[in-house]
Swiss-Prot record:
InterPro entries: Ribosomal_uL22, Ribosomal_uL22_CS, Ribosomal_uL22_euk/arc, Ribosomal_uL22_sf
CDD domains: Ribosomal_L22 (cd00336)
GO terms for MF: rRNA binding; structural constituent of ribosome
TM stretches of this protein: none
Keyword ATP-binding attached: no
Gene3D superfamilies in the cross-refs: Ribosomal protein L22/L17 (3.90.470.10)
Record carries keyword Chloroplast: no
Keyword terms: Ribonucleoprotein, Ribosomal protein, RNA-binding, rRNA-binding
Family: Belongs to the universal ribosomal protein uL22 family.
HAMAP family: Ribosomal_uL22_A (MF_01331_A)
Protein name: Large ribosomal subunit protein uL22
Role this protein plays: This protein binds specifically to 23S rRNA. It makes multiple contacts with different domains of the 23S rRNA in the assembled 50S subunit and ribosome. The globular domain of the protein is located near the polypeptide exit tunnel on the outside of the subunit, while an extended beta-hairpin is found that lines the wall of the exit tunnel in the center of the 70S ribosome.
Amino acid sequence: MARTGYSATIEGENVARAKANELPVSPKHSIEIARFIKNMTTTEAKAYLTDVVALKKAIPFKRFNRNVAHKRGLSKWPAGRYPVKAAEAYIRLLESVEKNAEYIGLDVENLRIDHAAANTGRGLRAFFPRAMGRATPKRRETVNIEIVVTEVA
């Protein structure tokens, strides 16, 4: 696996960051969650994503919303979904960035998400064996997720 950096260069004493590479999660769901949690605090984002996993609140889908039904509880955008697997990955990454912030001496209660991004990772290729000696290719999608938080006074 190649070494990859962060897509945003946010430097400073009150900055913590975390990254997860090649997670077996949908890139489209990850991009929508990253757009939604940007500029939230980490506690707000974790609480909302926990409700998404419990199917109580939906994530609004603004970009990848073809044939997406309206969901109850979305105020400004009607189309949405419950991306449970991607939300669980983001919860783990938010816990990681909070631990990183605590390690460098930041206050965990005052962390704001300044940068959240999801990029497609490496596609893992395999084949479905078929009848008559044929084979159909399959490709498993992966995603790289990164979060950068800053301490707000």
